[in-house]
Amino acid sequence: MSDELSQLDELIESDGIYRSLYKNKFEDSPSTKKTITKSKSLYVPRFDDEFNSSLVVDSWYKKSLWLYLLYPFALAVSYFTGRKRRKFLKNSLKKYKSEVPIIIVGNLTIGGTGKTPLVKYIATELIKLGYKPGIVSRGYGGKFKETLRVTNETPVKQTGDEAQILSTLNIPFYIDKNRVRALKTLNDNHDCDVIISDDGLQHYNMNRDVEIVVIDGKRRFGNNLSFPAGPLRESLKRLDSVDFIVNNSGPTEDGEHLMNVSPAKFIHLKSGKSYSVEDWPMHKQVHAVAGLGNPGRFFDLLARLGFDITRNPFPDHHNFISEDVHYLDHLPIIMTEKDASKCKDFDNNKIWYLTIEAEVSSKFMEKLDSKLKNLS
């Protein structure tokens, strides 16, 4: 096992695909500070790395046989994450304990499963039930130091894209590479009675009272192997210890709560004018743009709405530049809400974005409410 761990370290520390995937989905705060040298050269997207990365992810779900060459590394990751959790359970009393209940919304796989729409849904429903929720997040992709309070006026460059969606809730919301520090800041400055952590299932420095795992109902767990041979951050046995499993779009299995994600409205990025899905004001031949872990889900949604789309996929959390969406034709461009948040300053009048709303079966909120009441 020590040999596999040593080789895994080399694989992760190399400046390549697996380093990028690992840093995105496993690291919670930077361990070292690197000196950044500014350059006057024009920015050129690393499309080779992005393309190769998508090939690796696709291979996980196509169950490609070559991935078994990485099986020893997968065993090492599975061992490491299991040991990390066992250490947490053994020393949980020594970890930071929030004054109010903590709800973790996370997943077992690398890539997007719909955590942020679910966090928004849970927060909205808790407010309806009389709770005063707050939110903490890592703020992936944001450029900020220490703890940052996010409002609907905080620039996307500081917050990262996903935080922009949650900022519209107008509730206490803090981001920090160190989630525990964000928790402490929120508790010290606000009178919240429940806190939701967007992601953080594997962040065992943080105690938790409720664990919710979101799974992609279509792709599920791919080849069921741990990173880097597959998409799993932890063993599938981890599902036995969580409180709720929410299945994004189904089909569901026993014990899973179905979450449906529905299109809400189209919003023109420059003018802010909004239209219902039924009242789209232009022709339906469009460019569809998505920088998601699973862009196909967004493209399929537009196709079901009757659009004739040209697919333009980008990597998850892609930092868009104006050239990325500069198409020579005059077709409208439809993006996701989180991608559009990074294009507000572009001189492009063709960009629209589609807002979505998540909804989970009523029994889910009933059970969550009951569990929270039993904690008090």
Annotate each language-model stretch with its function.
Residues 1-43:
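C-terminal portion of ABC ATPase nucleotide-binding domains
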Residues 42-60, 220-334:
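C-terminal accessory "lid"/substrate-recognition subdomains
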Residues 47-101:
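A transmembrane-helix-recognition feature enriched in membrane-embedded lipid enzymes
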Residues 76, 116, 166, 198, ...:
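Residue-level signal for inorganic ion chemistry
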Residues 85-152:
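Walker A (P-loop) phosphate-binding motif
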Residues 131, 190-192, 208, 283, ...:
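Short, high-confidence coil segments that cap the C-terminus of an alpha-helix
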Residues 140-254, 267:
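Phosphate/Mg2+-binding loops and adjacent switch elements
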Residues 315-319, 350-376:
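Short, flexible loop segments at boundaries between secondary-structure elements
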